Amino acid sequence: IAYPKNYEEFQKHKRELDADEHPVRAKLGGEEVLDIQLRGEYAYAALGKGGFRFYDVAQIDNKDFSEKIVTAPVSPFGQKFYVKSKYATAIATPTTLGVDPLRRHDPQNEEQQIHLMYGFLYGTDKYEGLVVLGNNLKEKKDFAGVGTLLDGNPANNFVRRAATFNPDGKLNGARRITIAGVYAYILCDRGLEVVSLDDPLHPKITAEIGSPVLNEPTGVAVQFRYAFVTDKEGLKVFDITHLDQPKLVDGAKVLLGDARNVYLARTYAYVADGKDGMAIIDIERPEHPKLAQMFNANGELRDTRDVKTGMVSSSQFAFVADGEAGFKIVQLFSPVDNDKFYGFSPPPTPKLIARYKTKGPALIVSEGTDRDRGVDESGNQLSVFGRRGARPFNQQEMLRMYMRNGELYTVTNAPPGRPVDSHTPLKAVEEPDQQKKGSGEDK
């Protein structure tokens, strides 16, 4: 241990964490934070009746600042980082990286164009549906979208509502949003609504999945070709090979008693299972999920609302919003207690290592920064690659890896026939006994 005295004090205080920051209260008519997402120097929050607000957290680790979380470092005349709404419930960024589609590109770098949807933030409102946050492109050409959050220029710190989308009230009761490629997966009273953000100022619904497939859905997370959704019954799996049209995978279900939200980390899904603590589900075979273990730290996890995971050195941790029981940190594995920690996805050996008492119920935990994420589910580049002109596969190139004629390309353990030339159309290849005999060409 690097700091034995600090650790000894930590143990004496029963592993209780300290906080050196005064709670920040919203000034827009609401004080509850229903959702939060950190990106760069700002934390984006959905505040119920308080609408949406962006907090300046640039000095969170600076000892020279006494107030480390502020709504604005200047007067209201110089900054407006909030958007009013009737009842804001959730907020999402297309990526946790600082991707700016409005940034000027040098042609010599041979960079791909960044999709416009990355220039906005996306929130849900209980009554208004989907709220697109950012300045309108036509009205604010100098700082359109939310580019002001990324450009480092303090002279343009103003953000407004760019669009509102709730056709025929289909998004009423919207309470959770997850971005996958150019699609938003929104949970609402009707179930799961898939919304295309290909034109972010003119969204459109491409699919709806409601009862009896989904019953009061609470959380959704996406990994490669699958979406994992929690509802009143537990965890369910959807095939999203076609992002705009999710399909339920028959039998891919894990029954749970109080599922509130889900987070994915490689081959495991971590479900906030309310009064039952945290459910750890093996999703190595996504169409055949199975419960790996339930963990409640001997009853200390008793109102689990949300779980996010993160890595520090060679150890993995789960950060748990445990409702009325406060905030908890669970060590999932470390070199000390798991000899398989070097693997791609070590089996979790969870143990509670720290806790923090909150004045109100702990509801949500921000997702950390994505590491090594070069491309999204729709083939849009997210990261700068090492060489000029280097890029990931685009969508069509990705599909060629695992799709044939619109269907998923699979293989069998036993060869179905003789090898064929990969450049020869399959229809032109015939087995020897099917070839015509007696023709002049058969010599």
What residues fall within each predicted segment?
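Feature marking well-ordered beta-strand scaffolds used for ligand recognition
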Residues: I1-K443
